[in-house]
UniProtKB/Swiss-Prot annotation:
This is Tubulin beta chain. PANTHER family: TUBULIN (PTHR11588). PROSITE patterns: TUBULIN (PS00227), TUBULIN_B_AUTOREG (PS00228). Its cofactor is Mg(2+). It is found in: Cytoplasm, Cytoskeleton. The gene is TBB. One of its GO terms (molecular function) is structural constituent of cytoskeleton. GO terms for cellular component: cytoplasm; microtubule. It holds the Pfam family Tubulin_C. Keywords: Cytoplasm, Cytoskeleton, GTP-binding, Magnesium, Metal-binding, Microtubule, Nucleotide-binding. Mg(2+) binds at residue 69. It comes from Onchocerca gibsoni.
Length: 444
């Protein structure tokens, strides 16, 4: 079976990671102690993708929980599903990274990294045929960003041919925890560009907007935000966990979604968006789902797809529905919005359908877009980075851990290159190549 090893690092990573396990355990009929109480064989058919079976019918998540301080781990362990995880797979330090990327990447994190790799190795060796790794973390803090990217590069060294997927929470100006977020995020993106195959950019600002505007929650908590993230993660991984009419695994997803290796930052979306309380009352049609999916308000990254063009996109529908309906609606939306899809990748929207809907919904859909508009997000972080870096503000926290200013300069220019690459493909059209060929022919 194609197994996935899940790693969650830092406070944010552990919070969204734990929520993800709650959601999928529920979908697979697994209680907080790992016992199966489901009602359908489909729940167990591909359970090994995410769980190890220990004794008869007891399932343990193939998850590794990492942090540089014990606090978050303690609350996970005390939470509803705390007894589900394997006790040896909690790996934590005592010192904390203090929201400092350098501590996570070079000093504190580097000391803990070998014990984490031992656990990862152990999980990977127990796999029948390891498909890849999925990582949940934030880019704004110290552990998830600094130590997270360190782990990713180490795993990359050891398993170069396995897919590396990350769910990365990008800092946003409206929802800020620390003033040095732009530094941490830029240094992280510098790593992610080189070392991951697919990165789902989740943005707190977008999540807040969804809670506020669409779900009409007046004071959204992190719990509400994490609820949205887990719905999306559950949707993205549906195809891996359940049999369906059109299936995807991490590698197929990467092949369809990534036209150029550096441009693998996706914006996820989810439909129908309903708040936790009034989920059960809404009937949805395939047409409505498709409409909602491509709506800018539904994107989990705070950038507007109408400001760019889609290089590629994928939609994953869940529930009992006719494939014909789905195909018609997807074609329809592409024809209506053809200006927003690049014309030099024909058929750049892929669809998958899985028969099993999420709890309390008859139908749902998840959207993954590789849009050039994601550059807005990088631009935003980059501007904040430059503003501080010009004055060398807060740099001593990083140089004190042995970092060099050069590294900041490199990270900054790598981020700017990424933005220009997106811009270049946004402006490119199929006719350009044609015109160039004609011009060359004329000059010759």
């Amino acid at each position: 079976m194609r197994e996935i090893v899940h790693i969650q690092a830092g406070q944010c990573g552990n919070q969204i990671g734990s929520k993800f396990w709650e959601v999928i355990s529920d979908e697979h009929g697994i209680d907080p102690l790992g016992q199966y109480h489901g009602d359908s064989d489909l729940q167990l058919e591909r359970i090994n993708v995410y769980y190890n079976e220990v004794q008869k019918k007891r399932y343990v998540p193939r998850a590794i929980l990492v942090d540089l301080e014990p606090g978050t781990m303690d609350s996970v362990r005390a939470g509803a599903f705390g007894q589900l995880f394997r006790p040896d797979n909690y790996v934590f330090g005592q010192s904390g990274a203090g929201n400092n990327w350098a501590k996570g990447h070079y000093t504190e994190g580097a000391e803990l990294v070998d014990s984490v790799l031992d656990v990862i190795r152990k999980e990977a060796e127990a796999c029948d045929c390891l498909q890849g790794f999925q990582f949940t973390h934030s880019l704004g803090g110290g552990t998830g960003s600094g130590m997270g990217t360190l782990l990713i590069s180490k795993i990359r060294e050891e398993y170069p041919d396995r897919i590396m997927t990350t769910f990365s929470v990008v800092p946003s100006p409206k929802v800020s925890d620390t003033v040095v977020e732009p530094y941490n995020a830029t240094l992280s993106v510098h790593q992610l560009v080189e070392n991951t195959d697919e990165t789902f950019c989740i943005d707190n600002e977008a999540l807040y907007d969804i809670c506020f505007r669409t779900l009409k929650l007046t004071t959204p908590t992190y719990g509400d935000l994490n609820h949205l993230v887990s719905a999306t993660m559950s949707g993205v991984t549906t195809c891996l966990r359940f049999p369906g009419q059109l299936n995807a695994d991490l590698r197929k997803l990467a092949v369809n979604m990534v036209p150029f290796p550096r441009l693998h930052f996706f914006m996820p979306g989810f439909a129908p968006l309903t708040s936790r309380s009034n989920q059960q009352y809404r009937a949805v049609t395939v047409a409505e789902l498709t409409q909602q999916l491509f709506d800018a308000k539904n994107m989990m990254a705070a950038c507007d797809p109408r400001h760019g063009r889609y290089l590629t996109a994928a939609a994953i529908f869940r529930g009992r529905m006719s494939m014909k309906d789905v195909d018609e609606q997807m074609l329809n939306i592409q024809n209506k919005n053809s200006a927003y899809f690049v014309d030099w990748i024909p058929n750049n929207v892929k669809t998958a359908v899985c028969d099993i809907p999420p709890r309390d919904l008859k139908m749902a859909a998840t959207f993954i877009g590789n849009s050039t508009a994601i550059q807005e997000l990088f631009k935003r972080v980059s501007e904040q980075f430059t503003a501080m870096f010009r004055r060398k503000a807060f740099l001593h926290w990083y140089t004190g851990e042995g970092m060099d200013e050069m590294e900041f300069t490199e990270a900054e220019s790598n981020m700017n290159d990424l933005v220009s690459e997106y811009q270049q493909y946004q402006d490119a059209s199929a006719d350009d190549e044609l015109n160039e060929t004609i011009e060359q022919a004329e000059t010759e």
